[in-house]
């Protein structure tokens, strides 16, 4: 899980989701998991 000030899609399978007020990226590739911090 990467914590970043700006989250971006890294590939076509990445999905941006807002969960409990934080932006998250979920993807089939675990390296692409991110959350805005």
From Swiss-Prot:
Pfam families linked: Ribosomal_L36 (PF00444)
Domain of life: Eukaryota
Cell location: Plastid, Chloroplast
Single GO MF annotation: structural constituent of ribosome
UniProt keyword list: Chloroplast, Plastid, Ribonucleoprotein, Ribosomal protein
A cellular component term, taken from the record's GO annotations: chloroplast
Transmembrane stretches, start-end: none
One GO BP: translation
Family: Belongs to the bacterial ribosomal protein bL36 family.
NCBIfam families per the UniProt record, alphabetical: rpmJ_bact
The name this protein goes by in its record: Large ribosomal subunit protein bL36c
Native species: Chlorella vulgaris
Gene that encodes the chain: rpl36
